[in-house]
Amino acid sequence: MLYSNLSKPKPRRYSIPNEIMILGLSAGAIAVYNYLLYVEDRKTYQCYPSYKTIGKALKIKSKGTVAKYVRELEDKCLIYTEPTEVILKDGKKRNGNLKYTIRPIQDALEHFYHEQMQENALVM
């Protein structure tokens, strides 16, 4: 009973837009998107996990595979990435983790429908 007053950590709840299913994403890209939604800051829509951290969480062994899924999400306009720099104690600059920004689902849908219209125009 000594610990009964301690509160349990609240689970992180988030929703995944239903529209994700029509965008033609691979299962791995959906998993990476899901993870990024899980770790993002809910106010800024940003997060900084490394490829290694994402891979470990999703049991993907290769950093290259994680990078492929991240590129797929960028190509579908679901996320935006930008490089970061870390300054070490000795003043040297090193590459940091990517900064991921989750884009509004509407951006991805507009991109998807635009591509569909272009494909249909080529067929006609």
Question: Across the structure, where does each feature detected by a protein language model lie?
Answer:
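Winged-helix/helix-turn-helix nucleic-acid-interaction surface
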Residues: 63-124
